[in-house]
Amino acid sequence: MSDTLAVLPQYLLPKKLLTALAGKLAGAHGGAATTALIRRFVKRYNVNMAEAANPDIASYPTFNDFFTRPLRAGARPLAAADFISPVDGAISQFGAIEKDQIFQAKGHSYSTTALVGGDAALGATFNGGSFATLYLSPRDYHRIHMPCDGVLRRMVYVPGDLFSVNPTTA
């Protein structure tokens, strides 16, 4: 199947409604049903629970708790490298950021200004830099770690369409 045909349903389905429904289900305390769902997910995507601080699947009350599980100490030692990824995953795209350059993320084009919530001055500070798009598969650990000290000074909500993340759209 071509990439266009694989992505087409994402334009036709009610993305916000489906995302809200998935969020409610992921946060639901379903007892044995939640445990069965997590167990099936671990098996299907070959999730390495030995890396988790708590490898007991039955101890996660919600799918969100499982999905954002902490790692055990020492599971991700920092490499002595010039570049360290803050997440598990694979680099799906990498390139230079130039004035008004638009680059791909999730199969769609964005400008740096759009990616920082419409702040043109902030977007311009990235000109001359580089970007990397990191694809996290379902089996990947989904927390972000910074290999350096820092302080979060502000957060910006960036509205937009919600698209499935998979190798076709990554």
Predicted regions and their residues:
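Non-catalytic terminal segments and appended small domains
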Residues: 1-170
